[in-house]
Amino acid sequence: NITHIVNSIAAFEIHEWTSFDSPFDEYLNGDKQALTLKQINGMNLFYGKANCSSCHSGSLLSDQKFHSIGIPQFGPGRTRPFDPYARDVGRMVETDNINDMYKFKTPALRNVSLTAPYGHNGAYPTLKSIIKHHLNPIKMNKNWKLEYANLPKAPWLEEIDFVTFSDKREQDRIISSINIHPVELNDKEIDQLVSFLE
């Protein structure tokens, strides 16, 4: 049955593509030379001041829960079947619970430097930009530029790709759903976080 097939594929992917031999793992296993000082400072920020580990925790660096961080919305996403509006309401598509609106699953950060672009829809091209978004989601959402989107050339889709992004009421709903708090880091600290995650 389909459940067995899906579980088999998932087990294969976890076995083949999950890395637990990174410098971070070596550091945790006692090799204090595995990380540079910059990476150690980034790790300390990750688990401390930056509060990343409140959501990015466990062996996969994900709590496997759903959160709204106000990623700028573009593209059709996964709208609800009866919703004529091309928008992605996140977890609410599955639960029909308004409290899940615009919540997306916390991604695992294993090998995160290989998984750009970032955000559930690829809104940010670099680790630095998605970290900055997490630090101040309202400001970053409001300052997001259309050219950040890395979309395939599909003229027949261009008309709907930015309908949600251009809708002020929808943007206000996304921003009001944010459930993470701003954190203030300087550029040096952001670079340390990036170094740790890479």
Over which residues does each language-model region extend?
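Periplasmic c-type cytochrome electron-transfer domains
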Residues: 1-198
